[in-house]
Amino acid sequence: MDRSTFEAGLTRDGYEIVSITMKPDAVNPEHVHPFDARVMVVDGAMTVDREDTGARTFQVGEWFELHAGCRHSEAAGDAGATYVAGRRLPAKQ
């Protein structure tokens, strides 16, 4: 999938869009978000280690989703990583 198609889907589905760059080999330790996230790597590579599915490395053009409260960590590859992230607060019940 290309970036413009991914971003169009985020907008359609009510996500706020941000772009984030991680330096080479940077690590964002285990944490949770209060929002749902949909993320696509646009440069480099990043490994996401989720409590529910384990670790997976994502390359350019690959994407994943995290539901609010999903414990995970992120690590950039040796060339760093840039990704587009959509953030959306979960629906109130």
List each language-model region with its residue ranges.
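A generic "binding-loop/recognition-motif" signal
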Residues: P24, P34, G54, C70-R71, ...
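Short histidine-centered beta-strand/loop micro-motifs
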Residues: G9, V27-H33, D49-R50, R56, ...
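Transition segment at domain starts
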Residues: M1, E7-T11
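Conserved short histidine dyad/triad with adjacent acidic residue
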Residues: R3, E16-H33, A68
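Short acidic-glycine-tyrosine-enriched beta hairpin
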Residues: D52-G69
